[in-house]
From Swiss-Prot:
InterPro entries: CYB561/CYBRD1-like, Cyt_b561/ferric_Rdtase_TM. GO terms for molecular function: metal ion binding; transmembrane ascorbate ferrireductase activity. It is a multi-pass membrane protein. It comes from the Eukaryota. The chain crosses the membrane at residues 19-39, 53-73, 89-109, 127-147, 162-182, 199-219. Residues 20-219 form the Cytochrome b561 domain. The gene is CYB561C. Heme b 1 binds at residues 57, 124. This is Probable transmembrane ascorbate ferrireductase 3. Coiled coil: none annotated. Pfam families: Cytochrom_B561. It comes from Arabidopsis thaliana.
Amino acid sequence: MNLSGDRTTLKRHSSLSTLVAHFFGILAVVLMLIWLLHYREGIEYGSDNPLKVLNVHPFLMYCGFLFLVGQAMMTYKTAYASHQVQKMVHGGLHLIGLVLGIVGICAAFRFHDKVNLKDMVSLHSWIGLTTFILLGVQWLFGAFTFLAPQSSSGTRTRMMPWHVLGGRALLYMGIVAALTGLMQRATMLGQSTNAESRLINFLGLAILLFGVSVDFSVALGRYN
């Protein structure tokens, strides 16, 4: 059995998965911007137009939160840098994503206030907020376990598998939240144009394939 050859093949597959993830991730950002800026009213948190405020939510929850979380996961496993640099970039990208996610969630609540809608009544909102809170807990857990100098190497070794599995599970929960959010928004729009409907479908597929590619990259990245 050629272990060296197997490792080389897995490293190549990991690099390919990372490139594919970047492609679908950036494609989803572009499609999101086309949708919100061309077909919808635009993006503005402080606008008097409630629909512009609402558009901040999907923009920041994907482009600012989910996309950065995926990048953070791949950075830790696939970036060619020292382990300490990988950890700092991993934690930093997660933190930026969480901050932008808070703004995105506030935009949804702000929209509800403007149009007198109740908060937290949809499956999307339940999945989304649960995922966001758990990811915040995951970040705090990781900071105290893997970045704090007083944490022992034994503790880090024991906790690492759970941290990795939790991160991968939360990535998929975030993908589910994004897709249910797109479905909910499409339902709100009613009879939109065929071109817009197709764009939303392609956006959902790009987000899904981004998440799958990130997971493949992370799963194979341990062989780098």
